[in-house]
Amino acid sequence: MDVFQEGLAMVVQDPLLCDLPIQVTLEEVNSQIALEYGQAMTVRVCKMDGEVMPVVVVQSATVLDLKKAIQRYVQLKQEREGGIQHISWSYVWRTYHLTSAGEKLTEDRKKLRDYGIRNRDEVSFIKKLRQK
């Protein structure tokens, strides 16, 4: 494992990959390379506290792919910084909608492109209203 980390440290010194964190994962390196080749896009996810999470997904990603990418991003961030150990994602998705330009992303199988989401577009969380 040490050999892998040493090799990864050398790869991260490349100018295209220099903005990746020190404890980079292979998935993050692959995502950055896909971004450089135009095979992926960055979706800026705005939390209610104002924090913006740059999440990388493939160009043909669905809403479900975006949700899974958000989960991976938050999990990696928590591992690096500490903090809350467990988040109930089923509760998060049951309580909040993702929205883009005022439109709720309700269908998990629908492509982000069909909602008009492109590279560097913003998506935010909005609380679901209870239905009676």
UniProtKB/Swiss-Prot annotation:
GO terms for cellular component: cytosol; intercellular bridge; nucleoplasm; nucleus; U12-type spliceosomal complex. CDD domains: Ubl_SNRNP25. It is found in: Nucleus. PROSITE patterns: UBIQUITIN_2. Pfam families: Ubiquitin_4. Its main location: nucleus. It comes from the Eukaryota. Keywords: mRNA processing, mRNA splicing, Nucleus, Spliceosome. GO terms for biological process: mRNA splicing, via spliceosome; RNA splicing. Residues 41-132 form the Ubiquitin-like domain. Component of the U11/U12 snRNPs that are part of the U12-type spliceosome. PANTHER family: U11/U12 SMALL NUCLEAR RIBONUCLEOPROTEIN 25 KDA PROTEIN, U11_U12 SMALL NUCLEAR RIBONUCLEOPROTEIN 25 KDA PROTEIN. This is U11/U12 small nuclear ribonucleoprotein 25 kDa protein. It comes from Homo sapiens (Human).
